[in-house]
Amino acid sequence: MKNLLVRSIYKIKSTQWFRDRADEGDIYQHYMQMHKISLDSFKQHLQGDWEFVFFNKEVDDIQQVFQDHFFELYDLWKQGNNILYCGPDNLMIKPTKFFGEYNDFRMFNYTDPKSFNGIEHFLNADVRYYSADMNPDTWTEPLKQAENWDFSEWNTEQIILNKMLWNQEGRTPQNTIIPKMAYQAHGVWLTNDINQHIQRANAWNGCAIQDSHIIHLHGSRNAPNKLELMKVLHREFNENT
């Protein structure tokens, strides 16, 4: 059994995501720069013995990334590994344990919107943990759904993964949601009003940014600005400690 930190960055030909992102410049390079900062922060703080697995290729459409990576992660899990998936726009700012802490599939905090598509507690999928010991039946329905991927819906991946999470026996919001493990900074940008942004984000998350373990910057909401924000937060929380 290995402990794996996994992420992917694909070069995507189409600029159409949930909107046309052509105005953001070279998105691939922005994400690669975020990835380097992010990985440095995980090397600094992620506890335990672990290896890094990186998937990198070229595809036509963003939804291909999500579908491909669903099966890539499943293949790694079938080999008997514990897997922590964290996208490149995540910054770890405190010593943090994942490996061996959970025995099932986990996500940790809400996304925006907090309810969606009939899922009352709709969690963000950019920080997620697959225990090697999780029940294999957890995968049965999600694999069928992933084979019939809805390429027209931006949230297809999160819909599948939320159903996978909440269909597990004993999962409740009370024993699942831990905001500090995946602080959502979707509403924080590097502007003159950043302190106000953070205050609103703290209220939304239910915890203060400085008390979090991972900050998810949401690079899809303006990659150039989120990259600069990541640099600032990395200096503040990691390089000055």
Predicted feature descriptions by range:
Residues 32-39, 66, 121, 135, ...:
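A structural signal for well-ordered alpha-helical scaffolds and beta->alpha junctions
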Residues 53-57, 108, 180:
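Conserved beta-strand termini and adjacent loop/short-helix elements that scaffold enzyme active sites
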Residues 66-122, 128-137:
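GT-A fold catalytic core of metal-dependent nucleotide-sugar glycosyltransferases
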Residues 13-16, 61-62, 92-95, 100, ...:
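Short catalytic/ligand-binding loop motif for oxyanion handling, primarily in non-cytosolic enzymes
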Residues 127-240:
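Catalytic core and acceptor-binding pocket of nucleotide-sugar-dependent glycosyltransferases
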Residues 1-79, 222, 234-241:
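N-terminal anchoring/stem segment of glycosyltransferases
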Residues 51-53, 83, 128, 160:
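Structured N-terminal alpha/beta-domain signature
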Residues 36-43, 73-74, 96-99, 161-162, ...:
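Short amphipathic alpha-helical segments and helix-helix/interface helices
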